Design a protein with these regions (language model features):
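Active-site-flanking structural segment that lines cofactor/substrate pockets
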Residues: 35-67
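N-terminal amphipathic/basic leader segments beginning at the initiator methionine
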Residues: 1-47
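Glycine- and acidic-rich phosphate- and metal-coordinating loops
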Residues: 70-77, 107-113, 227-233
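Glycine-rich, mobile lid/loop segments that gate access to catalytic sites or pores
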Residues: 100, 105-214
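Channel- or pocket-lining gating/hinge segments that regulate access to a cavity or pore
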Residues: 193, 233-235
């Protein structure tokens, strides 16, 4: 296994971007991130076991019931948690993302991170998503910045390895510096890969692997309401050879 550059864009078929849309007051801070697969992808996710869960997790779990996704959208600055309209807001965020990308809303993984208990204003997201979609490219670093809250620096990595004679790539971005404690998923983590793997096997691999990785991380003993590790698989390179 070797480390490569590119973050979530290192795996074939993925693009990403991050912008400041206005959720956060500091205009120098990106607050909206997008990861996109050029084709529908197998996908899996694991979630916090906190009894209080953010609305985005509820919506994402429903969307991933079929084991498929094509995009991940995440805002920072507001967790969309403990809000009466949280589910509706998360669903609308998915719909806005889907419209900007011309995909189905149920193929969008939605996540939010930030202050708990404050309503999430969709106006800046509604305005920013078309711009964000248009900016998609090899911008994993932007997406990594877009999901940060109290983090002191962005977190991204990508590795390559050989399996069955084929080169596979896994990329990832993450956020989290507080409210980190085992009981999955410890923090927000978005992974991408171009490995040929089915949705059931992907879920089994992810669920098993986090036990010896993310579930061993503790900073302050607080399990967050919005923790998630999500991974879509792009088959762009496979379709190119069909």
């Amino acid at each position: 296994m070797k480390q490569v550059t590119g973050g979530v864009c290192a795996a074939q078929g993925f693009s990403a971007a991050g912008i400041h849309c206005g959720i956060r007051k500091n205009q120098a801070k990106r607050d909206l991130a997008l990861i996109y697969s050029a084709v529908p992808a197998s996908a899996a996710a694991v979630y916090t076991t906190n009894l209080v869960k953010g609305a985005p997790l509820t919506v994402t779990k429903a969307h991933l019931a079929d084991g498929k996704a094509q995009a991940i959208v995440c805002n920072s600055g507001n967790a969309n948690t403990c809000n009466a309209d949280g589910i509706a807001v998360a669903e609308e965020m998915s719909a806005l993302t889907a419209a900007a990308l011309h995909i189905a809303p149920q193929d969008v993984i939605v996540a939010s991170t930030g202050v708990i208990g404050q309503p999430l204003d969709l106006a800046p997201i509604r305005t920013g998503l078309p711009q964000l979609a248009a900016a998609l490219g090899d911008h994993s670093d932007q997406a990594a910045e877009g999901i940060m809250t109290t983090d002191t620096q962005p977190k991204e990595i990508a590795v390559q390895f050989t399996a069955g004679g084929k080169t596979c790539t896994i990329g990832g971005i993450a956020k989290g510096s507080g409210m980190i404690h085992p009981n999955l998923a410890t923090m927000l983590v978005f992974l991408t890969t171009d490995c040929a793997i089915s949705a059931p096997m992907l879920h089994a691999a992810l669920t098993g692997d986090v036990q010896d990785t993310f579930n061993m991380v503790s900073v302050d003993g607080d399990t967050s309401t919005n923790d998630m590790v999500a991974v879509p698989v792009s088959y762009t390179h496979l379709r190119a050879h069909e």
